[in-house]
């Protein structure tokens, strides 16, 4: 680098022989100066940032490392500093000139401001009285305008003009939007009069309230008469309440008595219309005797009693739904407004306050009011429906039809309860009809059972279900299929069906049990199982009979146990081992029990030989003979299972006998392999297993 080279050269020059020769003639002071310079150069740290910056500056200036450059370096640097200072002084001179010009401008502005301030002060002194007078006049004008607006607002808010009073009270004026607007204004005036009554001077408030109340009374009377006329001309075949009459009813709700009178009038008219329509649907003729050829009479089209009742109920349901849809626009959409009007209207009817003294007034429920009105509208048709259905129920002599009628009525009872309420007249009517149909069903069932009392004494020779049970189960199956498709309001269908089973099934089960009591075992159990299995097969497909199916299964299990015990007794007696089983039943492998074996008569050699021979005669046909005992059991799988259980129990007892005989032989010092001499002729201790050679495995094979 240039700076490094410059320094190295400078240092080399300072130490060269030539330099030394030049300074030989110098004084001792010159030598000291040179020495200090060399020491200073050598002590300079190249890590010093300022030193590095100085070297970088020399590099950037492009100075050549010559003797001339080294001599002029300091002079050039001083000249550059002087030139820079001169430029700065020139710039400050120009700044001073600009500041002098700004000072002159500010002086001129101050002079102009002082002159303007003087002129404004003079003008203010001249106009001040005029402005004060003008302010006073403006304030007075503002007060007059406020009083004018207040008077106008008071008159417009608390007073009805003559034309609006005429619209509100005169019957010659129509009930239209203008009427309702004026009515709303009059109601607002009466409410706002309460504010006037709060002042010390109540005269104006009392007068305005009295006049407004009188106009409102006349308006509600006019509205009441108008609604009555509209109801008379309303299309009652399709009672869609228009927006005008709905609005009128909402307004009339502030007079609960008048509102209720209108609803009563409407309900009475609809009751008559629906009664006539139902009669026409039944007979094809109107109540006046006119034939309506557009109607297909239900009485002529429905020859089946069930369809006849179903068509009548379907017509009633359709009419009820139509009534509700037509009226719910008023009670659901406008229910809140009606409820609010009735609440405010109770305070205006003094006689209601007296009648309800000390009692909390009932809250208006739109849905409840709708249900009550619809129920009243169809009450006439409900009475006619009750008469016709009662006639069908009382003339019916078929058990299944009686239940189907009750089930159909129960279905519609649930439907109407969802549509109206449980307390409605129509639902109560159908509930009574359903109860009457069930009474008729129970009566017919009892008559049917009474007619079968003679058949309850006869048992089929094949122990199959008696003749009376088969049609009875077919009848029960039809009843259960009907109930399965029914709509019930209760969540526990099984509990609801128990009374039906008590009437349609329990008497027949009791009859089968009574018949079985006259039979000897095992026929009684076979007969009862056949009957119970037939009943169980009918009940199993239905979920709501699971409890009864389980009860039947338990009873069948008990009877099966009896049959199994009977088959076991047959194996004991027919095999000739009954006495042997009884003899060893209480014996164990204890020495004292084993010693008693040869003292027991059934286990004597001659008795064992006889028992063994009889067992051999029994075993080849034992299983077939046992199955023959219960051959009339219709469930062959159950018969085989019962016989197998009895055979297993027989084998277990036989195995116990086998073990006891083996223990007896061992206690006598003999082994099962010892052979008895043919010359003994039972004279000495005999090998019991030789006398009784059959094994348990052989018995299991022969009885399996």
UniProtKB/Swiss-Prot annotation:
GO terms for cellular component: Golgi membrane; Golgi transport complex. It comes from the Eukaryota. The keyword Transport applies. GO terms for biological process: intra-Golgi vesicle-mediated transport; protein transport. It is a peripheral membrane protein. InterPro entries: COG6, COG6_C, COG6_N. Keywords: Golgi apparatus, Membrane, Protein transport, Transport. It is found in: Golgi apparatus membrane. Its main location: Golgi. Belongs to the COG6 family. Acts as a component of the peripheral membrane COG complex that is involved in intra-Golgi protein trafficking. COG is located at the cis-Golgi, and regulates tethering of retrograde intra-Golgi vesicles and possibly a number of other membrane trafficking events. PANTHER family: COMPONENT OF OLIGOMERIC GOLGI COMPLEX 6, CONSERVED OLIGOMERIC GOLGI COMPLEX SUBUNIT 6. This is Conserved oligomeric Golgi complex subunit 6. It comes from Pyricularia oryzae (strain 70-15 / ATCC MYA-4617 / FGSC 8958) (Rice blast fungus).
